[in-house]
């Protein structure tokens, strides 16, 4: 597989990383008393241990240049020492804390079956395969979004909405001060995306590119099933084409 084909196939995977329920999460249609389920599953599935996932990719990587980039990523995720000022998993908990949720719930989260499968995949991808698969899954798939093409092609991007317009602030009353993680992500996003794509496109051996793409497609399938399960648990129903988004009959917009 040549480099351009590799690039386009990876971008095709990422452009499918769009979930039908996300517009409901970002428009206040999820009941406030069920929103904790989303946060708990995200935290337990990958947020809490994301520094560990990055660390596994670092340990497996034989290329000093990429290790240095992963080490910087790991240091920021684990300590917040470069930008955020606090470990990113702890800053994530500021969302539920600011919404008045019981943080003890996050100490013993029972993962949904689909979440367990996705987490098992993340563990396998970062422990049992090559550095290339570990780095691609962690730094491109997990950290990345459906808009990777804009970041990769350095297109002029629309500036993000003010923090005051963040859905958790606008619809659920989260204090803006609790968005420290969102603010940090905005500060480091550009450099992280560039480093991640440089590592994969310029250092993965041609004979390994097919395996990386196949694993990324597997990540997409498992992630989609995981988000389906979270949406269902939060009372959301996949909308029929042309219909209004559906939530359960008890739903109320916060």
Model-derived features: positions:
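Non-heme di-metal
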Residues: 1-254
């Amino acid at each position: 597989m040549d480099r351009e084909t590799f690039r386009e196939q990876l971008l095709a995977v990422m452009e499918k990383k769009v979930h039908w329920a996300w517009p409901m999460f970002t428009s206040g249609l999820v009941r406030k008393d069920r929103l904790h389920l989303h946060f708990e599953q995200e935290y337990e599935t990958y947020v809490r241990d994301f520094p560990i996932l990055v660390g596994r990719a670092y340990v497996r990587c034989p290329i000093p240049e990429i290790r240095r980039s992963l080490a910087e990523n790991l240091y920021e995720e684990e300590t917040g020492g470069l930008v955020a000022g606090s470990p990113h998993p702890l800053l994530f908990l500021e969302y539920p804390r600011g919404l008045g949720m019981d943080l003890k719930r996050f100490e013993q989260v029972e993962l949904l079956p689909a979440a367990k499968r996705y987490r098992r995949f993340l563990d396998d991808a970062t422990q049992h395969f090559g550095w290339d698969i570990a780095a691609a899954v962690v730094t491109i798939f997990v950290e990345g979004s459906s808009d990777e093409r804009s970041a990769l092609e350095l297109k002029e991007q629309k500036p993000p909405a003010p923090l005051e317009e963040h859905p958790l602030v606008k619809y659920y009353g989260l204090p803006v001060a609790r968005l420290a993680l969102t603010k940090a992500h905005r500060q480091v996003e550009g450099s992280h995306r560039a480093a991640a794509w440089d590592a994969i496109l310029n250092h993965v051996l041609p004979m390994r590119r097919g395996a990386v793409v196949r694993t990324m497609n597997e990540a997409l399938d498992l992630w989609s099933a995981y988000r389906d399960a979270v949406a269902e648990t939060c009372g959301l129903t996949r909308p029929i084409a042309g219909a209004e988004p559906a939530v359960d009959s008890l739903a109320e917009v916060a």
